[in-house]
């Protein structure tokens, strides 16, 4: 099954996540089909906290990709910010 989930990056004590489309059997930070955005939970100042390619996210959801709980909330937040 194809899922949209977060892949962790960044360094110790400073997380940074990529929103990735991947097979659910792949490792969290492993192989992916496409990166559709990023999430920076510790963004400060002028840094961007969330960026999502809405067009690609809509495409993958239309193809049957299942978002994780956190990604579903982030997609909702991104849609609200763009509206």
Curated annotation (Swiss-Prot):
Keywords for this protein: Ribonucleoprotein, Ribosomal protein
Alphabetized GO MF terms: structural constituent of ribosome
GO biological process: translation
Transmembrane helix is among the record's keywords: no
Family of this protein: Belongs to the bacterial ribosomal protein bS16 family.
Alphabetical list of Pfam families matching this protein: Ribosomal_S16
NCBIfam families: S16 (TIGR00002)
Keyword Lyase on entry: no
Protein name according to UniProt: Small ribosomal subunit protein bS16
One Gene Ontology cellular component annotation held by this UniProt entry: cytoplasm
InterPro entries found in the cross-reference section: Ribosomal_bS16, Ribosomal_bS16_dom_sf
């Amino acid at each position: 099954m194809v899922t949209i989930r977060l892949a962790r990056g960044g360094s110790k004590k400073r997380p940074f996540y990529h929103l990735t489309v991947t097979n659910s059997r792949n490792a969290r930070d492993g192989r992916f089909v496409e990166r559709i955005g990023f999430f920076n939970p510790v963004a400060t100042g002028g840094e961007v906290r969330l960026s999502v390619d809405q067009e690609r996210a809509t495409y993958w959801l239309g193809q049957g990709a299942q978002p994780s709980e956190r990604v579903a909330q982030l997609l909702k937040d991104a849609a609200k910010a763009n509206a």
